[in-house]
């Protein structure tokens, strides 16, 4: 699965087209701290986080501590201070390009579709936007809102997102939304990737994508398991006992990540690739409050 520079892998073009069609009218939901009192974006300006940007009229329900009483003394108008983080919401989307993300065509297509949905919804909402490809390092895409021009590395790196932060020199947006699309299928300690993702963010989200064959593998007499990232091979009989132990370990693994995410205020959202493959069904993204 390789791609020429600055183009999406042609094989996944149908997935991109389906995701663009599904996301055409969607918007990314801003956390309450970076939206107006009614949940709507107020405007758009440039500037650094926490930098004063402009005033707006007081509305019932606004925090009274943000009224500028000096302005009121001069004009007898109640005015609220706004800061650049409220005027210019920001979003970083990080796509895991480790080899396990393409263990099936369906899983790879779903991961790409999710990246398209989030970047399109963020652009529709007027967010400043970064798309990061997590391969041997984090690569910032020059065209985050145009999937057909993405500089797309193949899903074949042995690195997982938790292996990258130490070598990652580029900045995430400060006080923005960060969304990591990955499968978390590795032996790594959750603390490093979750701490890096959440540090300085208003909201951090991990979208855990697994293929139906990973969620519920079918029994089989003899199978050869190949680690897509190390090449290690192991022959197994997928009988009832083996599958029971697999499900127990998978549940323990997911619970470990969920606990670590909750401790750090990160939303962990498990998804099935089947909902983002031939048909886009983003219901869980709405239920989680990520899209509107």
Language-model regions: role of each:
Residues 1-44, 56-65, 71, 76, ...:
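Exposed, interaction-prone extracellular/peripheral surfaces
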């Amino acid at each position: 699965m390789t791609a020429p520079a600055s183009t999406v892998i042609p094989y996944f073009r149908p997935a991109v087209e389906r995701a663009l069609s599904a996301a055409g009218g969607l918007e990314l939901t801003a956390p309450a701290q970076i939206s107006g009192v009614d949940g709507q974006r107020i405007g758009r300006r440039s500037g650094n986080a926490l930098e004063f940007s402009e005033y707006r009229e007081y509305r019932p329900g606004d925090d009274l501590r943000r009224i500028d009483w000096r302005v009121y003394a001069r004009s007898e108008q109640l005015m609220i201070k706004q800061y650049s983080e409220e005027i210019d919401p920001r979003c970083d989307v990080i796509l895991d390009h480790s080899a396990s993300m393409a263990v099936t065509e369906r899983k790879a297509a779903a991961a790409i579709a999710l990246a398209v949905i989030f970047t399109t919804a963020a652009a529709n909402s007027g967010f400043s936007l970064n798309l990061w490809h997590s391969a041997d390092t984090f690569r910032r895409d020059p065209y985050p809102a145009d999937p057909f021009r993405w500089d797309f590395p193949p899903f074949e790196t042995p690195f997982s997102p938790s292996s990258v932060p130490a070598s990652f020199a580029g900045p995430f947006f400060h006080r923005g939304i960060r969304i990591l699309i990955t499968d978390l299928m590795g032996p790594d300690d959750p603390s490093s990737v979750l701490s890096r993702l959440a540090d300085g963010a208003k909201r951090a989200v991990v979208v855990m994508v697994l293929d139906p064959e990973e969620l519920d593998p079918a029994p089989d007499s003899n199978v050869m398991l190949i680690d897509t990232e190390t090449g290690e091979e192991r022959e197994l009989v997928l009988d009832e006992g083996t599958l029971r132990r697999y499900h127990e370990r998978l549940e323990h693994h997911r619970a470990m990540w969920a606990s670590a995410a909750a401790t750090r205020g990160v939303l962990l959202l498990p998804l099935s690739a089947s909902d983002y493959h031939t048909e886009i069904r983003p219901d869980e993204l709405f239920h989680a409050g990520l899209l509107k």
